[in-house]
Amino acid sequence: MDASMMAGLDGLPEEDKAKMASMIDQLQLRDSLRMYNSLVERCFVDCVDSFTRKSLQKQEETCVMRCAEKFLKHTMRVGMRFAELNQNAPTQD
């Protein structure tokens, strides 16, 4: 968990901070695994169509690489956009 998230927990007792940090870490891990599984499924379905060999054909391998790069670039762009929106959002104090 990063420092900006911990700053929001300043008013809590240490035990509650630890519980919240653990919960946030679990949620981040779950989301990372979900994103990975989504990437694998999408690229496999879109790119792999021959099951005559145990390894990918060159065109399938190229397709998977492009698919993964596109997915990750899109995910990074969405994350950057959310960060921009969060920076510009008014805070409630």
Swiss-Prot record:
Entry keywords, A to Z: Chaperone, Disulfide bond, Metal-binding, Mitochondrion, Protein transport, Translocation, Transport, Zinc
GO cellular component: cytosol; mitochondrial intermembrane space; mitochondrion
One Pfam entry name: zf-Tim10_DDP
Intracellular or extracellular location(s): Mitochondrion intermembrane space
Tissues where this protein is expressed: Expressed in roots, flowers, young cotyledons and leaves.
Cystine crosslinks: C43-C67, C47-C63
Source taxon at top rank: Eukaryota
Twin CX3C motif (motif): residue ranges: 43-67
GO terms of molecular function: metal ion binding
GO biological processes: mitochondrion organization; protein transport
Role: Mitochondrial intermembrane chaperone that participates in the import and insertion of multi-pass transmembrane proteins into the mitochondrial inner membrane. May also be required for the transfer of beta-barrel precursors from the TOM complex to the sorting and assembly machinery (SAM complex) of the outer membrane. Acts as a chaperone-like protein that protects the hydrophobic precursors from aggregation and guide them through the mitochondrial intermembrane space.
Entry's family note: Belongs to the small Tim family.
Subunit note: Heterohexamer; composed of 3 copies of TIM9 and 3 copies of TIM10, named soluble 70 kDa complex. The complex associates with the TIM22 component of the TIM22 complex. Interacts with multi-pass transmembrane proteins in transit.
Free-text domain note: The twin CX3C motif contains 4 conserved Cys residues that form 2 disulfide bonds in the mitochondrial intermembrane space. However, during the transit of TIM9 from cytoplasm into mitochondrion, the Cys residues probably coordinate zinc, thereby preventing folding and allowing its transfer across mitochondrial outer membrane.
Record protein name field: Mitochondrial import inner membrane translocase subunit TIM9
Naturally occurring in which organism (per UniProt): Arabidopsis thaliana
